[in-house]
């Protein structure tokens, strides 16, 4: 399902004020010309200006603080509605500038076992520069990048494991990222 997205709301409501959006979140920077600023919402970037409001970041990390679970469509809707409510603007009407998809697969063997076998994906060329990147394999074809990696190892490195329910996580979790 969806992972990282960039949403931009250009159809601003009547009475919109970018300062009120930033006052509802953790604002950390303002434009010198006084036309907008940046802030954080659940650790993800919000930009509010006179002409638009944008969100950029991982939806599951915004909702749960990690992305070791694949989001359902209902989870995505819940997250965007929560974003809209917290910012005070209808982000559910925003345009999607880009979206990255991810899905987690529970595996019976360590992900490195499968990573070695992926070089045979038809039509995709593995990137040589990804060698030694800690168990991540990238493939490119016609502007599409597919990434496979050991999600549990990555989450441990970044300290993004869920605070509750760690024991119920699968031992081997493989993530496909598109």
Residue ranges and their predicted role:
Residues 1-178:
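Structured, helix-rich domain cores that form ligand/interaction pockets
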């Amino acid at each position: 399902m969806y992972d990282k997205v960039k949403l931009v709301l250009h159809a601003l409501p009547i009475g919109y004020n970018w300062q009120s959006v930033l006052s509802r979140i953790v604002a950390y920077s303002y434009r010198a010309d006084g036309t907008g600023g940046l802030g954080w919402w659940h650790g993800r970037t919000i930009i509010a200006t006179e002409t638009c409001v944008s969100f950029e970041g991982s939806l599951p990390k915004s909702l749960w603080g990690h992305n070791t679970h694949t989001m359902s469509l209902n989870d995505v809707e819940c997250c965007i509605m929560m974003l809209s409510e917290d910012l005070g603007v209808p982000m559910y009407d925003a345009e999607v500038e880009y979206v990255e998809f991810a899905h987690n697969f529970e595996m019976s063997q360590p992900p490195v076992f499968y990573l070695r076998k992926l070089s045979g994906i038809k039509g995709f060329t593995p990137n040589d520069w990804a060698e030694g990147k800690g168990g991540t394999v990238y493939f490119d074809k016609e502007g599409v990048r597919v990434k496979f990696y050991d999600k549990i190892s990555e989450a441990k490195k970044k300290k993004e494991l869920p605070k509750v329910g760690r024991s119920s996580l699968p031992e081997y979790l493989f993530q496909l990222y598109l």
